């Protein structure tokens, strides 16, 4: 009988609506005397095609990036938001793929269980996937950004997308047992929300620090306050007190900002493992550190010369921000990019960074490997290029923060007409939704691990920023010659044409004899020289070192967390290597990516640039390396913070992609 029914089913599938005559029944083992039976095959289900243009996952990623731009500047928290929402969308998508495995849905993570129940899958899965994805993303955005300063705009954008997709904003059902995609999306969102309340981020208390306290009182920065008289420890982070301070998202903060996320190493990571972790106890708190890079150079340690060299290099590179100094650079991939290796010790840094002229030992490329043509030269003033880099990669006020910036780059890569969306560069070309879901999941996990690792290190080592160190060393004097005035072993090292002593005939001493013997720097002159940033430039010249400023907005100056290791370097190298892994090539589509900069219509800190230019990168790593250097020109990081971040980012990308692949292959 079973054989008979199988044959009957096969025949119906082949012929559709038929009359089962005795001959057909006989062929299936039926009796010839049976009367004719009419059986109607249901019409084939019409499968919904992929939508043209952006996938639903991409639409929600754009809403999330908008939300980040309108929230407080919290790169750690937004890396987590990007990961959790990308992962929730992946879970909602994978439920409808019988052989796929989700990340949190149906699993247990760090003691939190998100149980799952089986239900009958529809034949036409795409509409259900889109609906579940949308409700999952919508509910988490709704929860995570409810107290954002831009919450009205954020929720208006999220509501508008839901309504444009034809979804009911008020359906909060969680019972998906009968196959409701709405309930499934809500349930997955609920899992991530509950998981986020106990993952170590301290979300219930608005991510507040539980133990960390700064050892240094705030450095007051204003036109009338000079030097750094309040610092107690030149190795440790110092808060900044700035009138009218705004965070990286442009939100005004009336009090001296606290250290953002020094305890972030406690947060449940993605692919980081206990094998990568070291625990350090300070002031009764256990700092969890992944990929520990070791102690940075300290002012009174065996590496004191590296300490002074690194921070003095930051002040010297500040002199490169002058469009009128006559220095011209080829900024094309013909001359920039293609770094083969990094220094492996602090003592080797001086061989990697070009202290006087700026930049690194990159060699560029002979040919574009895609077109087999040489890259065209692009000659521009160094002072324009360095300022553009400092602002392009700043991810400062009103930006999507560094992890979000790399999602923007990912989206640009995905949009490129020459990209073949083959996962890891092999196999079938994926549809837009599957590509976006998988790439967001991979990038989200990688950015989250970068935040957990970098900020765990920041909290543990609590390292000083350039604006604090340079001003503090300037107050002490010069450390080069005991026979010269103002000698102090921990002062700034003298460098002719860059770091010098103020003499009696110096213009800085004209009418101000109290400045004789102080340290002066040839550097960007600071925001006091810019009244109208649309039309004026501070320029580069000799200033008192006690008045040195980073190339930043006067009401922002420096991010409110420790420098070592650089978050930008960690995020960027991890993202770049991840992009190489998921696309299967080190190169951007077409062998180069570009960003157009229009003369006198790009810079925000001051007027410029004086010429139009195109930022160009041959490979993902070239973009990452450029981002790292930009933070030195911007006065935010010394080399000490940079290279360890790059090395750690590369390790994170490897582990993250391995975990992603193992999940996809299950």
Language-model segment annotations:
Residues 7-10, 31, 117:
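General secretory precursor processing signal
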């Amino acid at each position: 009988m079973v054989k008979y029914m199988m044959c009957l089913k096969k025949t119906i599938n082949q012929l559709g609506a038929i009359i089962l005559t005795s001959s057909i029944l006989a062929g299936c083992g039926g009796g010839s005397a049976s009367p004719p039976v009419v059986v109607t095959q249901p019409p084939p289900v019409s499968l919904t095609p992929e939508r043209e243009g952006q996938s639903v996952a991409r639409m929600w990623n754009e809403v999330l990036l908008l939300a980040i731009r309108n929230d407080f500047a919290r790169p750690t928290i937004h890396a987590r938001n990007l990961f959790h929402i990308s992962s929730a969308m992946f879970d909602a998508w994978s439920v409808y793929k019988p052989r796929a495995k989700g990340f949190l849905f149906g699993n247990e993570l760090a003691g939190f269980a998100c149980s799952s129940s089986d239900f009958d899958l529809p034949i036409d899965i795409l509409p259900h996937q889109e609906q579940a994805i949308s409700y999952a993303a919508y509910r988490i955005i709704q929860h995570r950004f409810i107290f954002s300063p831009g919450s009205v705009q954020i929720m208006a954008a999220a509501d508008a997308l839901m309504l444009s997709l034809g979804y009911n904003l008020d359906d909060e059902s969680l019972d998906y047992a009968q196959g409701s995609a709405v309930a499934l999306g809500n349930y997955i969102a609920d899992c991530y929300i509950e998981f986020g309340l106990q993952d170590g981020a301290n979300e219930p208390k608005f991510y507040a620090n539980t133990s960390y306290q700064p050892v240094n009182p705030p450095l007051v920065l204003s036109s009338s306050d000079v030097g750094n008289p309040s610092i107690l420890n030149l190795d440790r982070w110092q808060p900044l007190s700035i009138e009218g301070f705004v965070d990286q998202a442009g939100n005004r903060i009336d009090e001296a900002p606290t250290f953002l996320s020094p305890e972030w190493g406690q947060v449940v990571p993605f692919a980081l493992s206990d094998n990568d972790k070291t625990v350090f106890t300070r002031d009764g708190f256990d700092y969890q550190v992944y990929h520990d890079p070791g102690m940075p150079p300290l002012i009174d340690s065996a590496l004191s010369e590296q300490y002074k060299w690194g921070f003095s290099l930051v002040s010297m590179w500040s002199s490169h921000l002058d469009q009128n100094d006559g220095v011209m650079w080829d900024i094309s991939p013909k001359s920039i990019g293609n770094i083969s290796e990094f220094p492996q010790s602090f003592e080797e840094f001086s061989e990697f960074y070009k202290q006087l002229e700026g930049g690194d030992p990159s060699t560029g490329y002979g040919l574009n490997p895609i077109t087999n043509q040489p890259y065209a030269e692009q000659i521009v003033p160094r002072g324009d290029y360095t300022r553009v880099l400092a602002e392009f990669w700043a991810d400062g006020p009103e930006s999507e923060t560094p992890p979000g910036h790399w999602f923007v780059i990912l989206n640009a890569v995905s949009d490129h007409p020459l990209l073949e969306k083959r996962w890891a560069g092999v196999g079938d070309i994926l549809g837009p939704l599957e590509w976006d879901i998988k790439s967001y999941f991979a990038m989200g996990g990688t950015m989250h691990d970068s935040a957990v690792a970098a900020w765990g290190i920041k909290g543990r080592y609590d390292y000083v920023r350039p604006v604090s160190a340079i001003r503090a060393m300037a107050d002490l004097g010069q450390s080069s010659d005991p026979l010269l005035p103002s000698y102090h072993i921990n002062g700034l090292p003298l460098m002719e044409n860059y770091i010098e002593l103020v003499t009696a005939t110096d213009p800085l001493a004209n009418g101000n004899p109290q400045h004789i013997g102080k340290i002066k720097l040839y550097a960007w002159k600071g925001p006091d020289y810019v009244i109208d940033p649309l039309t004026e430039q501070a320029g580069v010249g000799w200033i008192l070192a006690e008045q040195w400023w980073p190339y930043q907005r006067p009401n922002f100056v420096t991010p409110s967390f420790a420098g070592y290791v650089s978050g930008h370097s960690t995020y960027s190298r991890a993202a770049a290597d991840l992009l190489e892994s998921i696309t299967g090539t080190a190169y951007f589509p077409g062998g180069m990516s570009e960003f157009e900069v229009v003369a006198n219509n790009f810079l925000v800190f001051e007027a410029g640039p004086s010429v139009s230019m195109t930022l160009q990168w041959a490979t993902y790593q070239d973009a990452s390396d450029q981002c790292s250097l930009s933070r030195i020109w911007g006065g935010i990081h010394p080399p000490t913070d940079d290279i360890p971040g790059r090395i750690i980012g590369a390790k994170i990308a490897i582990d993250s992609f391995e975990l992603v692949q193992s999940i996809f292959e299950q």
